[in-house]
Amino acid sequence: MRDGMITEEQCGENFAYILEDKTDFLITEYKMMHGQEADFLLKCVKMLYNGKTELYYDTKSCLPLAIQSGAEDTEGMLSVLGNILHEVRRVTENGFLSLLKLDISADKIWVDPATRKIRFVYLPVAERLHKDVVEFEEHLRGCLLYTSDAADE
C-alpha cells in the first residue's frame, strides 16, 4: 500500500493491514477510533501477525461503495453521497482524527445497505495516506465521480 510499509491482506469478507514497523502504529488515534463519536469508522481490531502489528477491519453488514452504488437508484445514490460528505465533516470536527488517514478508495468506503450509513477505513499510523487536504478532496471527488458514473451504467 504505502511503499511496502503497509501490506493489505484479505481475510474472507474482511481485510487487514499489516504494518512492517510497529512504531508506525499510533495508539491515541486507535483509541479515538473506538470512541462513541466515531461510529463513522469501520470497526478495527489491533492484533499481532507473525510479530507485526495487524489492523483487522470487520466489514460485517456493510458493502463497499463500489458495489452498493450499483444497487441504488438516483435518489438512493444522492442519499449515500450526502452521507459520505456528512461523515467527512464529522471526521474533521473530531479533532483527534485526520482526513489524511482515511482510505477513500471506492472499495474502502463501506455502506450499510439497510440504512445507507457510511463507514470509513481509518489507519492509525504515523504516515499519511494523502499529503494534504487538497489531495484528499481531489481523491474523494474522483472516487465519487467514478462511483456515480459506474452507477449510471
Ranges and model annotations:
Residues 16-24, 29-78:
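Conserved structural core of kinase catalytic domains
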Residues 10, 48, 111-113:
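Generic beta-strand structural signal
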Residues 89-98:
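Protein kinase catalytic-loop region centered on the HRD/HxD motif
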Residues 100-144:
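Catalytic activation segment of kinase domains across protein kinase-like and atypical kinase folds
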Residues 146-153:
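Conserved small/polar residues in nucleotide/adenosyl-binding loops
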Residues 1-5:
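Gram-positive cell-envelope targeting signals
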Residues 76-87:
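Conserved alphaE helix
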